[in-house]
Regions:
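Internal amphipathic alpha-helical repeat/solenoid segments
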Residues: 60-69, 90, 99
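A common structural microfeature
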Residues: 12-14, 61, 78
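Active-site mouth loops of central-metabolism enzymes
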Residues: 49-63, 139
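Active-site region of glycoside hydrolase catalytic domains
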Residues: 2-48, 72, 90-93, 100-486
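Catalytic domains of carbohydrate-active enzymes, especially glycoside hydrolases
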Residues: 63-84, 289, 293, 364
Length: 486
């Protein structure tokens, strides 16, 4: 890994960690909260590994004071969390003041600790009542989302500066409506492309409303990205396979937001599923409302081919319920293992992919728009089975984060405007269809006692945040930065 400027990051670089409401909060039936699509989906036989759910999760709802103190001890400058639509507007309609009060207390605790709240309005927990009316396949949900956004701003707008509308709408649309591996568990490609468009419309409507309320707010969007490479660059079919995955994963969201249009090739690919029929007269001008930042979630890239046998593209959890491809127009496209190390999710570890992605985003999207980038999620699941003196020695996760932060440094040195990095995740939590089988946290959670214990990666990350630089260490050694946390 190339290091620039003695491992230092730009002045003001934001160090944080991220979670999501359903994954950490628990308190699923308290203070007026009602079912989200994930509560419902978790009850479907075979949908989630071990039939687990977020009823208790990490109990962040009751332990957020302890958790904020932990964040402060880790030198975090920002905490990226999501508000639960099912807690704030439980039926999709009337506001539940008790639900908003939780986020008000959390925000006050964060500000009291000197930690910037980084709020995400939607991280996949649509109220079940709205799903019963069609969910994201129903255009009306976009307008209900804008109303929900304003109800959150009513209470938190005086204290929260950074507002993210959606987290990873690709997952909401295509894992939720095409593959069926996420809530609401549908497998209908036409519904998936409808959800895609309505999610983007929801983003644009909420961004417009929030900026109309307060033009000084930082309003942005978080997208997950892949880097799709043809397995054989000299094979036109493999080149087309990479184009299809890039189009249906990356460009289908980034192009409307930054260019005000869907890519022509993607529209052609998806023509059988009717994407164009959902685009209203003013929709693309709403969707391309200027934003103040782009959040980038990156975990891995992939080499793709149209030559079987190879691996299926989806790495769905081994739940009993059958799933389908999340790509409406990539039948016959496969993933090709490249011999790279992999995480416990089976995802290849490819930090140079993040470097390439950031260069591309700066060149094609954010640079021309004058919009900064933040890494809003990056991290890895590993076994965490090496424990010394009660501390998880997660050297593999530490090295994963270190390598990807190095890729960020390389991108910054190449002129990319990256202003912060949020580790995924602050703590082990409910990993969607995987249940509690996969641990992404830099803090270990004992799911019986709910005790939190910082892992070696957390201690290393705390030192990086304190010094605004990559800590120097001997190869194979985790740094002893306990003193900096006391």
């Amino acid at each position: 890994m190339t290091q620039h400027n003695n491992g230092a990051f730009p002045e003001g670089f934001l160090w944080g960690a991220a979670t999501a409401a359903y994954q950490v909060e628990g308190a699923a039936s308290e203070d007026g909260r009602k079912d989200s699509i994930w509560d419902t989906f978790s009850r479907v036989p075979g949908a989630v590994v071990n039939a687990e759910n977020g009823d208790v999760a990490c109990d962040h709802y009751h332990r957020h004071g302890e958790d904020v103190a932990l964040m402060k001890s880790l030198n975090l400058a920002s905490y990226r969390f999501s508000t639960s639509w099912a807690r704030i507007r439980p039926d999709g309609g009337a506001v539940n003041p008790a639900g908003l009060d939780f986020y008000s207390r959390l925000t006050d605790n964060l500000l009291g600790a000197g930690i910037k709240p980084w709020l995400t309005l939607y991280h996949w927990d649509l109220p079940q009542a709205l799903q019963d009316a069609g969910g994201w396949a129903n255009r009306d949900t976009a307008y209900r989302f804008a109303e929900y956004a304003l109800s959150v701003h009513d209470v938190l707008g005086d204290r929260v500066q950074a507002w993210t509308t959606l987290n990873e709408p690709w997952c909401s649309a295509y894992l939720g409506y095409a593959s069926g591996e996420h809530a609401p568990g549908l497998q209908d490609r036409s519904l998936a492309v409808a959800a895609n468009h309505h999610l983007l419309l929801a983003h644009g409507l909420a961004a417009q409303e929030l900026k109309a309320r307060d033009s000084a707010l930082e309003v942005g969007l978080t997208l997950n990205f892949t880097v799709a490479d043809p397995a054989d660059q000299d094979n036109p079919e493999d080149v087309d396979a990479a184009r299809r995955i890039d189009g249906q994963f990356n460009r289908i969201f980034a192009d409307p937001v930054f260019h005000g249009a869907y890519p022509a090739d993607v529209l052609a690919d998806l023509a059988p599923y009717g994407l164009e029929h959902h685009i209203g007269e003013d929709d693309l001008s709403i969707i391309s409302t200027p934003i103040d930042f782009l959040g980038v979630n990156y975990y891995h890239g992939e080499a793709v081919t149209k030559t079987p046998p190879a691996q299926a593209l989806s790495t769905a959890a081994p739940a009993a319920r059958p799933t389908a491809s999340p790509y409406p127009a990539a039948d016959g496209v496969y993933s090709v293992p490249r011999g790279l190390p992999v995480t416990n999710m089976g995802w290849e570890i490819q930090p140079e992919g993040l470097h390439r992605l950031l260069l591309r985003l700066q060149q094609d999207y954010t640079g021309p728009a004058g919009v900064p980038l933040y890494i809003t999620e990056n991290g890895a699941a590993f076994d965490d089975d090496v424990v010394v003196d009660g501390i998880v020695q997660d050297q593999d996760r530490l090295e994963f984060i270190e390598a990807h932060l190095g890729a960020v440094q390389d991108a910054v040195a190449d002129g990319v405007d990256v202003r912060g990095y949020f580790a995924w995740s602050l703590m082990d939590n409910f990993e969607w269809a995987w249940g509690y089988a996969k641990r992404f946290g830099i803090v270990h959670v004992d799911y019986q006692s709910l005790v939190r214990t910082p892992k070696a990666s957390a201690r290393w990350f705390a030192e990086a945040a304190r010094t605004n630089a990559l800590p120097q260490r001997a190869s194979g050694e985790a740094p002893d930065v306990v003193s900096s946390m006391q």
